[in-house]
From Swiss-Prot:
Residues 526-548 are annotated as: Disordered. Forms a cylinder of 14 subunits composed of two heptameric rings stacked back-to-back. Interacts with the co-chaperonin GroES. This is Chaperonin GroEL. The lineage of its organism: Bacteria, Pseudomonadati, Pseudomonadota, Gammaproteobacteria, Enterobacterales. Its EC number is 5.6.1.7. One of its GO terms (cellular component) is cytoplasm. Together with its co-chaperonin GroES, plays an essential role in assisting protein folding. The GroEL-GroES system forms a nano-cage that allows encapsulation of the non-native substrate proteins and provides a physical environment optimized to promote and accelerate protein folding. One of its GO terms (biological process) is protein refolding. Transmembrane segments: none annotated. NCBIfam families: GroEL, PRK00013.1, PRK12849.1, PRK12850.1, PRK12851.1.
Length: 548
């Protein structure tokens, strides 16, 4: 283990503070409707331009290791806020910077850091309660549009598109963001359950003009096994042929004699049939087959459950109003499953999402949830250049997260007004001693920082505007986009309560740890000895001279 560089007390805190300020100053210029752009250099390709706080924070690494520790701790605030609510990263960074700066001034003046932290925590707990009281539900399309517009940096088209997507697939539906091919943003909605497996043979196609397979009111056979022997399938094929309905087979694989027999039967018109592979792999495939069986009201034929395909009957098959299959996807529309069973399955998947630890697992579970809930919406972002496309896509994703947060916990007045009102309501809060009172005042002062920065970025005087907003009541605030005062809700400037709450809680948590830091330890930079060896005349072969 190499030698360490250790710094104590004020010396350590000053270094850490310098790192905090470098990162926060780079991030906070993006805040508000008149926030500025930040250009990020990339090791290859064109530089990217962004107004997204967390994108800026992720790029920053400082040369001085002590300063870098400060910067990384604030980066953690931005990441945590982003993970919790999907937005509010710039606000969280700004709140953390303000608490750390004011808090360290108090520590330098001789205050007890632990009491300062207790005061800050007390103020934040009270502020969160007040935020909940100020919050109003966000359920109608107009409010969702407004939240989306604000979070997409005043892009009304994006706000309207997100509201339309939520209306079509529901608040729980999956909405994904993809890069489009044109200049305009587009919304594509897939109703029913769709999975990425196409037909196993083009001979199943019954709509040659569009190249798809379309089955009306089909039976659906689900098998968690490979099917290669046609004898296993004969009893069920005969039963389906008598019923006069088409059949969709979803199995791990279908090959050889079994596939050939199905193709021949389909082409001769004996049984209208199509076959696709089951989606996913391993345990995920088993779970998705189970989802399809619940959605269609059938059973999965599984050898693990001692079920035999040869003995299966029409009772084991699922049903749907319509199935559409192309070369890449299968869509099941109007499954005949019981609503209660589907709701129970949805509840089970929600529970799994809460317990999942990896982002990948959560994403896959959310996809399954949406497919059972009734649809997937795809927002296709259009732009003229690749640089603009990346910037726009990041903004649309932010706006989508913000609207979801708004639906979950409601909305408060935006533009930094909610935190100013909260600070006013808890201004009489007191701690157990004077040091805790100073901690409370540090937190209250920090709650004004977002409004001050929004005003500063728009080119006005922060103190004048902040005092005017403080003199007002309720939702009265400053609209930086139009440079006028009024009701923020009427202006359509809303913030999701969850975003504001998460930003405040995470900022106070990390800032409190930084204020109570007394020692910092990092590796000493190593001297590069390889250059000394390379410059020696023997080129690293010294010591061999005596062998002559």
């Amino acid at each position: 283990m190499g030698a360490k560089d250790v710094k104590f007390g004020n010396e350590a805190r000053i270094k850490m503070l310098r790192g905090v300020n470098v990162l926060a100053d780079a991030v906070k210029v993006t805040l508000g409707p008149k926030g500025r752009n930040v250009v990020l250099d990339k090791s290859f390709g064109a530089p990217s331009i962004t107004k997204d706080g967390v994108s800026v924070a992720r790029e920053i690494e400082l040369e001085d290791k002590f300063e870098n520790m400060g910067a990384q701790m604030v980066k953690e605030v931005a990441s945590k806020a982003n993970d919790a609510a999907g937005d509010g990263t710039t606000t969280a960074t700004l709140l953390a910077q303000s608490i750390v700066n004011e808090g360290l001034k108090a520590v330098a003046a001789g205050m007890n850091p632990m009491d300062l932290k207790r005061g800050i925590d007390k103020a934040v707990i009270s502020a969160v309660e007040e935020l909940k009281n100020l919050s109003v539900p966000c359920s109608d399309s107009k409010a969702i549009t407004q939240v989306g517009t604000i979070s997409a940096n005043a892009d009304e088209k994006v706000g309207a598109l997100i509201a339309e997507a939520m209306e079509k697939v529901g608040n729980d539906g999956v909405i994904t963001v993809e890069e489009g091919t044109g200049l305009q943003n587009e919304l594509e909605v897939v109703k029913g359950m769709q999975f990425d497996r196409g037909y196993l043979s083009p001979y199943f196609i019954n709509k040659p003009e569009t190249g798809i397979v379309e089955l009306e009111n089909p039976y659906i056979l689900m098998a968690d096994k490979k099917i290669s022997n046609v004898r296993e399938m004969l009893p069920i094929l005969e039963s389906v042929a008598k019923s006069g309905k088409p059949l969709l087979i979803i199995s791990e694989d279908l090959e050889g004699e079994a596939l050939a027999t199905l193709v021949v039967n389909s082409m001769r018109g004996i049984v209208k049939v199509a076959a696709v592979k089951a989606p996913g792999f391993g345990d995920r495939r088993k779970a998705m087959l189970q989802d399809i069986s619940i959605l269609t009201g059938g059973s999965v034929i599984s050898e693990e459950l001692a079920m035999d395909l040869e003995k299966s009957t029409l009772e084991d098959l699922g049903q749907a109003k319509r199935v559409v299959i192309n070369k890449d996807t299968t869509t099941i529309i109007g499954g005949s499953g019981e609503k209660q069973a589907i709701q129970s399955r949805i509840g089970q998947i929600r529970q799994e999402i809460q317990e999942a630890t990896s982002d990948y697992d959560k994403e896959k579970l959310n996809e399954r949830l949406a497919k059972l809930s009734g649809g997937v919406a795809v927002l296709k972002v259009g732009a003229a250049t690749e640089v603009e496309m990346k910037e726009k896509k990041a903004r649309v994703e932010d706006a989508l997260h913000a609207t979801r947060a708004a639906v979950e916990e409601g909305v408060v007045a935006g533009g930094g007004v909610a935190l100013v009102r909260v600070a006013g309501k808890i201004s009489n809060l007191r701690g157990h001693n004077e040091d805790q009172n100073v901690g409370i005042r540090v937190a209250l002062r920090a709650m004004e920082a977002p409004l001050r920065q929004i005003v500063s970025n728009s080119g006005e005087e922060p103190s004048v505007v902040t005092n005017n907003v403080k003199d007002g009541k309720g939702n009265y605030g400053y609209n930086a986009a139009t440079d006028e005062y009024g009701d923020m809700i009427d202006f359509g400037i809303l913030d999701p309560t969850k975003v504001t709450r998460s930003a405040l809680q995470y900022a106070a948590s990390v800032a409190g740890l930084m204020i109570t830091t007394e020692c910092m330890v990092t590796d000493l930079p190593r001297e590069d000895k390889s250059s000394d060896v390379a410059s020696s005349p023997a080129g690293g072969m010294g010591g061999m001279g005596g062998m002559m």
